Structure formats: C-alpha cells, structure tokens
Amino acid sequence: MAQKSKKEHIIRTALTLFLEHGFKGTSVDLVVKISGVSKPTVYNHFPDKAALMHSVIKTWVENNQPTISLIKDSLALTAIIEDQWLTSEALSLYALVIGEGRRFPDAKHFFWHSFDANWQKAFTNAVDNSALPVGLTVEALLDQYLITRLKKI
C-alpha cells in the first residue's frame, strides 16, 4: 500500500470510528485494530489523536463540497438537501463537531467556514437563480425542511 493510500485508509477508518464512538470513545489502538495498520504507521502520519481528528474533518469537508446548479422546485431542493448536504453522515459529523468544538476550535472553525458556509452560499445562489417564489430565503427553506423532517421523528 502506498504511503498516501495508507494515510487515506487510516482517515476513512477513523471517520467511521469517530462518528460511531465520538472522540473520547475512539482510541488510536482501535483505529490501528480496525484499519489493520501498525501503531507506528498511524503515528508517522498523525502525531496524536487530535491531529487525526482534525485531518478526518478536513478531508471529509474537502470531499463533500456543494455541487448545486439550479433548483427547479421545492422537491428538487429537498432532494439536494437529503442526498448531498444533510446526509446521515453529515449530520453525524455536525454532532461530532458541535460536541467536540471546545476541544478542537480550529477544526470547528474550519468545518463551519469550509462546509456549512459553502453550502449556505451555494443554496443562496441556486435559490436566487431558480423558479422558486421571489423573496423566499434559504433560511426559510431550510427551516421548512427541518420542521418537516422533525415531524417525522
């Protein structure tokens, strides 16, 4: 396995573990066990668990940037939200970032400004250029979506 792919494999494994067990519940030993690499390999790429957590968030955000063109109607909007933005994995990462934000302020800042803010901008641009009613804001659409989703719980 090439160096870069080992690092990516460790990050993918750690993402799954952090989302499932949180930061405190995920040890480097568990990452080693599940990823099938040695402890020195993990530490060659990441000096500590905090650096691994930051790399996980950074890599995930870089791989999940918005790709929205035109929103034709509210059904298209809902599909984009569910399929691209607020996926179950994204919601789990939001929870992780919120829960660990004090411990990792740089990662939290990066997440909000590089993921959430980019989605907000992309939606604003898409809504502004769509056939949706004039004056309808992204915030109103998202509120409507979240209320509908919460009612299903």
Region locations from a protein language model:
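Amphipathic alpha-helical linker/stalk segments
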Residues: 54-85
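Amphipathic alpha-helical packing segments from all-alpha helical-bundle domains
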Residues: 85-92, 105-132
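A general structural signal for well-ordered alpha-helical segments in protein cores
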Residues: 49, 53, 78, 91-94, ...
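Hydrophobic/aromatic residues within well-ordered alpha-helical segments
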Residues: 49, 56, 60, 89, ...
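Helical hydrophobic small-molecule/effector-binding pocket
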Residues: 74-109, 150
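N-terminal intrinsically disordered/low-complexity leader segments
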Residues: 1-5
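Amphipathic C-terminal alpha-helical segment
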Residues: 83, 99, 121-153
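Helix-turn-helix
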Residues: 9, 13-51, 55
